[in-house]
UniProtKB/Swiss-Prot annotation:
Residues 1-41 form the signal peptide. Residues 409-450 form the EGF-like domain. Residues 916-933 have a biased composition (Low complexity). One of its GO terms (biological process) is cell-matrix adhesion. Gene3D superfamilies: Laminin, Tie2 ligand-binding domain superfamily. This is Dendrite extension defective protein 1. It comes from Caenorhabditis elegans. InterPro entries: EGF-like_Ca-bd_dom (IPR001881), EGF-like_dom (IPR000742), EGF-type_Asp/Asn_hydroxyl_site (IPR000152), EGF_Ca-bd_CS (IPR018097), EGF_dom (IPR024731), Epithelial_Barrier/Signaling (IPR051495), NIDO_dom (IPR003886). Residues 738-749, 798-809, 978-992 have a biased composition (Polar residues). The keyword Cell inner membrane does not apply. Glycans are attached at N240, N416, N571, N756. GO terms for cellular component: dendrite membrane; extracellular space. Residues 738-765, 795-856, 878-897, 906-933, 978-998, 1106-1125 are annotated as: Disordered.
């Protein structure tokens, strides 16, 4: 039985294998076909069936082999299919437009609006309009005033239907076409679009087609066509309403464009996605119709509908959520189960409580009861998501509760301790709270309470509130006042802080013999109003504040305040005024780094509304140094709260530890306000007074130093002649005595009276009066480059013969900016860039018993001799002309920083220099000043900045012209000044003057560019030669590769044959030998090389010719970077060399 069953299973398996061999059985009845396998299995021999199965298996293997072979063939040479897909598959479809379509055109102007009367009116937000205006700025208006462009129209008070509201300039390019269609394919297409978008069967009566083609912006150059804007508005008028179809073909730029619908009530409007943003370009790529760039809208009476019932979203691609239904899912469900049909809004189980009617949208009157809110609550009507009114109650600010039952006050001061500033006081009131800064602090009380003008005094000791009250205060730390140590002070209500006994408290300060401080001495009556408080404090904040004030004004950062006595007069009056004065006086004790005990008084006036003849001052024990404050004793004393002596309005600071008081912090400041400095610079006198001329004395021969570039001349007064040590920047003249000793004795015997020209070393050369010192503090500001002052020395008259007569004795040139000084040795400061030089030149003075050469002889007898001496001196100075320096002008590159440079030349350059000044008879002080002017030219380029334009393609945005100032710096040539003493001039060498340097400048201006151009030409020629050589080598190499095949090139050799040199004939023999080997014939298929087979890095047995891929069999081997130079590398080759 098991054998029979096995036999039946094999028969069934054979039946499945032979289904393709018995096609004739398909025509037999189905029942016979099921019985036939069983019958055949019982009648036929199983061995024959097994043999048939083996044959069928062989056939199946053969079919599989052929199928695999077919796939391999397809893999070796696949069929290339090129598919070009453009995304998106659909694009916006503009209606036909232009003159060929029968359109009319707007004029080529700016802000154009064309009036058009329609056949059928447009329904827009519940109103019908038969007259519209076609606007060039990308909209359809319903009013004549809508043609003017203005931004922010959504929302606004003007009715618009705007596909793309933008400022277009038709004068710059672009056209606007429009036409009204009442029949034809346009109406049919509009009808089908409406039916597809809203599932409504409507009949289109007319259509208005408006096309804005290639719009250009305003105030810019014309953009390329791909950057222009092209869009269309198709308005379909039906019996069931108006539909608007916006079609965007190309959006290339925007200037804040907007798209949408505006009802004109400044509230109701509809904006397209990305309207008013730079992303408005995406209107071309998206749409709510399923086609990019096409948007369809239904203009109903109340609002604009974008999607059909059951759909919502900007692009109408979302279904309504639970509880929503209708177009744009704008309606809410009022069903008992909470959900309704998304299209019709039907409720399967009925409406919810208080709702009935179609789709449960009617609210019952019994549910419309008004709710009574609690006290301190606000009742208002709110709207839910569906726009339905809901009455709500809410507690007012400062109260908590539900608003319907109760609203309790919130105590913010208890619930939040940090709600006010730490220096403020919190006060709670019903529904509110207040933060008030403490006394002595000012601010909003919540975020800021900084220390006020006056120091805090609300906790200080107060004087009795009566007239003429006093208080004696014993100091915890004694104060040094007016040179004496004080331990007790008396404070009176009349505004006095006295050190001595106060005998009377009325009259004037000068009559009271008072020693102390009077911040505001007046008829103050505390019994009427105000208060006076006193306290000695050591608070850190107070001391830090006064320390900073004193350190900043007295230039002593080491001063530290240790204690302060604070006396405050708060809102004090004389009994007749309604508004009182408030001021404060601080006596500050401290010391500096030298442990010097210092005391200051700081008077601070906040409010001084009344005066009544009051006085203010500091009365020292030395009456001559007492200080009365400005306007003391007058009605103008109220100005103390606005003025100051430390540049802080209302604050006056004085140092009082010494008997001699100083009205200002610095001795060079001008009292009483100390807001400017004393002028110590002399004013140049217009002429020398007669009494001053008599005291003038000519200086003795000596050395005159070349001054440093600080615009200061410091003449040296020298008595007698001597040896002068020569140094750098010192012009030294060696002179012999004017007369011998015998001549001096002879001339001294003459008794005729004569003027005395002698002088003492301590007497100044020039005497100036007080009015000559009237220069401002900025008189010494250097506004030009430094200059060099050359002062030649005097020569004795017997140095050279042949003199020129001079009948007039010139006076020295006193063109200086600082007072003259007398000194035996003068230090000459040098600039950092100059070379090292002796700081001063020692000068030997004449002995006191030696007589000056100018004192010998009488006036009458020496008149002729004196003139001869002057002529001799003049002629002696003539000998220095060959040694006088010269100012050389060297053109320098333009200095963009605007700073002129002073360059010092060497001694060799000084030999060719000449001085341009003339020497005088006795002493000539000549100043040569050369200024390098810097001219700054400022040019303003007016530009008109166009509005910002967003261009959405690769076209670059036009650049706005810059409105910044352009500065052209014109720099004069720098001055080269000699810095070394001149040597003996060589007459054979030519003199180089300024004119010659100017002649050289044009030549250099031409020569330098020519040399630069020649250098560049040489570089270019070299580069061209290198490039040509490389191209020639590459061309020859390519010819060889074409002749000998792809295998031509550098070939690696085995290590064994490394030292053996082979020839071209050896390669030919090897090629002939290899060509006769049949084992390698398959590998040589398709080769064009004459050198045999390609070499491989692996044995030949691993690479069967039949299994090589196309790339392996056809691509030449790579000879790049295979380590050919490494002698230790060994290769295995498929070929035999």
């Amino acid at each position: 039985m098991l054998a029979h069953t096995h036999r039946i299973n094999k028969c069934l398996y054979g039946q499945n294998q032979m289904r393709n061999r018995h096609a004739l059985l398909g025509a037999l009845p189905p029942i016979f076909l099921l019985l036939l396998p069983l019958i055949s299995c019982m009648k036929f021999d199983p061995e024959r069936i097994a043999a048939r199965l083996r044959i069928d298996e062989k056939w199946d293997q053969l079919d599989a082999f052929q199928s695999i072979k077919s796939r391999r063939g397809r893999q070796i040479q696949p069929k290339e299919i090129s598919i070009q897909v453009t995304a998106p598959l659909f694009s916006s479809r503009l209606f036909d437009y232009g003159t060929t379509a029968g359109d009319e055109e707007l004029p080529q102007a700016l802000d154009v609006g064309k009036k058009l009367d329609l056949v059928h009116p447009i329904s827009f937000f519940g109103s019908d309009y038969k007259t519209i205006y076609i606007l060039s700025n990308g909209a359809v208006g319903f009013e004549a005033s809508s043609r003017s462009y203005k931004s922010g129209i959504l929302p606004s008070s003007t009715r618009f239907l705007a596909p793309f509201w933008n400022r277009n300039d038709l004068r710059n390019g672009g056209k606007v076409y429009y036409r009204e269609v009442t029949k034809g394919r346009v109406l049919e297409r509009g009808q089908s679009e409406i039916r597809y978008q809203y599932d409504k069967n409507v009949k289109v009566k007319s259509a208005l087609i408006i096309t804005w083609d290639k719009m250009q912006p305003l105030n810019t150059a014309a953009l390329p066509e791909e950057n222009t804007n092209t869009f269309q508005a198709a308005i379909f008028i039906t019996a069931n309403g108006t539909f608007a179809n916006f079609i965007y073909s190309n959006i290339g730029w925007t200037q804040g464009a907007e798209a949408g619908f505006n009802a004109g009530d400044a509230t109701n409007h509809f904006k397209l996605p990305t309207s008013g943003t730079p992303n408005i370009m995406y209107l071309e790529e998206y749409g709510n119709t399923g086609i990019p760039g096409e948007w369809m809208f239904e203009l109903s009476e109340l609002r604009v509908i974008s999607c059909k019932s059951g759909i919502k979203g900007d692009t109408c691609d979302q279904e309504c959520s639970n509880g929503e239904w209708g177009p744009d899912c704008a309606y809410c469900c009022h069903c008992s189960e909470g959900t309704c049909h998304p299209i019709s809004g039907d409720c399967q189980r009925g409406c919810a409580t208080c709702w009935d009617g179609v789709a449960c949208q009617t609210r019952q009157e019994k549910c419309a009861t008004k709710t009574q809110c609690a006290s301190n609550a606000l009742s208002f009507n709110d709207y839910d998501r569906c726009g339905e009114p809901i009455q709500r109650c809410q507690c007012l600010n400062g109260y908590k509760g539900d608003g319907y039952n109760n609203c309790e006050d919130v105590d913010e001061c208890k619930t939040n301790s940090t709600i006010c500033h730490k220096n403020a006081i919190c006060t709670n009131t019903p529904g509110r709270y207040f933060c008030m800064c403490k006394e002595g602090f000012s601010g909003d009380g919540q975020n800021d309470c900084s220390q006020s003008f006056l120091f805090q005094y609300d906790t200080h000791h107060q004087l009795p509130r009566k007239k003429n009250s006093k208080m004696e205060w014993n100091l915890k730390k004694p104060l040094k006042i007016f040179g004496e140590t004080t331990e007790k002070l008396t404070v009176t209500s009349t505004g006095l802080i006295a050190i001595n006994e106060v005998n009377r408290d009325n009259g004037r300060l000068e009559d009271m013999q008072l020693v102390g401080i009077a911040p505001f001495f007046g008829p103050i009556d505390l019994s009427r109003n105000g208060a006076v408080s006193v306290e000695e404090v050591d608070d850190v904040e107070v001391l830090r504040r006064v320390t900073r004030t004193i350190g900043e004004n007295y230039n002593d950062p080491t001063f530290v305040a240790k204690s302060a006595l604070v006396v405050t007069f708060s809102n004090v009056t004389d009994g007749r005024q309604t508004k009182g004065n408030t001021f404060q006086a601080l006596l500050i004790d401290g010391s500096n780094s030298k442990n010097e005990k210092m005391t200051f008084v700081e008077l601070m006036y906040r409010d001084l509304p009344w005066a009544s003849g009051a006085e203010a001052g500091i009365l020292s024990s030395d009456a001559s140094s007492s200080i009365l404050l400005p306007a003391s004793g007058t009605e103008a004393i109220s100005q103390l709260s606005k003025n100051s002596n430390i540049k802080q309005p209302g604050t006056w600071l004085y140092r009082i530890d010494k008997a001699q008081l100083m009205p200002c912090a610095q001795p060079i400041q001008v009292p009483p306000y100390c807001d400017r400095l004393l002028s110590t610079a002399p004013r140049l006198p217009s002429k020398l007074l007669e009494e001053k001329k008599e005291g003038l004395t000519l200086p003795s021969p000596g050395a005159f130093l070349v001054d440093q570039p600080s615009e200061t001349i410091v003449p040296t007064l020298v008595r007698g002649g001597g040896t002068v040590t020569r140094g750098r920047n010192v012009l030294t003249v060696t002179t012999s005595p004017i007369g011998n000793q015998q001549r001096q004795q002879t001339t001294k015997a003459v008794t005729r009276p004569r003027p005395n020209f002698s002088s003492t070393p301590h007497r100044p050369i020039v005497s100036l009066s007080d009015e000559d010192f009237e220069l401002g503090p900025d008189a010494f500001e250097v506004t030009f480059p430094p200059f060099v002052t050359v002062q030649p020395e005097l020569f004795r008259p017997n140095q050279r013969n042949g003199v020129q007569k001079s009948t007039q004795r010139p006076l020295p040139d006193f063109s200086i900016r600082t007072p003259l000084k007398e000194e035996a040795t003068t230090s000459v400061p040098r600039e950092k860039t100059s070379s090292a030089a002796p700081a001063h030149s020692p000068i030997e003075e004449m002995s006191e018993n030696e007589e000056s050469p100018f004192e010998a002889g009488s006036f009458d007898g020496e008149a002729v001799k004196f003139n001869e001496e002057l002529e001799a001196i003049d002629k002696a100075l003539q000998t220095t002309k060959k040694q006088r320096p010269e100012l050389s002008v060297t053109p320098q590159p333009e200095d963009l920083s605007g700073d002129a440079r002073v360059i010092e030349t060497t001694e060799e350059d000084e030999e060719e220099a000449e001085i341009s000044t003339e020497t005088t008879t006795e002493m000539s002080s000549t100043t040569t000043t050369t200024k390098a002017h810097t001219t700054t030219t400022t040019m303003m380029i007016p530009t008109e900045a166009p509005p910002s334009i967003f261009v959405f393609t690769t076209t670059q945005k036009p650049r706005a012209q810059s409105t910044t100032q352009k500065r052209i710096i014109v720099q004069q040539p720098s001055i080269v000044v000699n810095s070394q003493p001149p040597k003996q001039r060589n007459d054979n060498q030519p003199t180089v003057n300024v004119g010659h340097a100017e002649e050289q400048s044009p030549r250099l201006a031409i020569l330098l560019p020519v040399m630069i151009i020649l250098a560049w030409l040489v570089i270019l020629v070299c580069i061209g030669a290198v490039v040509c050589c490389k191209r020639r080598n590459s061309r020859e190499s390519s010819q060889l590769r074409a002749m000998y095949g792809a295998a031509y090139g550098v070939r690696p050799t085995a290590y064994e044959s490394k030292r053996k040199e082979s020839t071209y004939e050896d390669h030919l023999e090897r090629a002939a030998r290899l060509s006769g080997q049949p084992a390698l014939s398959g590998q040589q298929a398709g080769k064009v090389s004459l050198y045999g087979s390609y070499w491989n890095l692996e044995p030949l047995s691993n690479h069967s010719p039949a299994r090589l891929s196309t790339q392996e069999r056809q691509s030449p081997p790579s000879f790049v970077n295979n380590g050919y130079t490494n002698q230790t590398t060994r290769y295995t080759y498929a070929g035999h060399y």
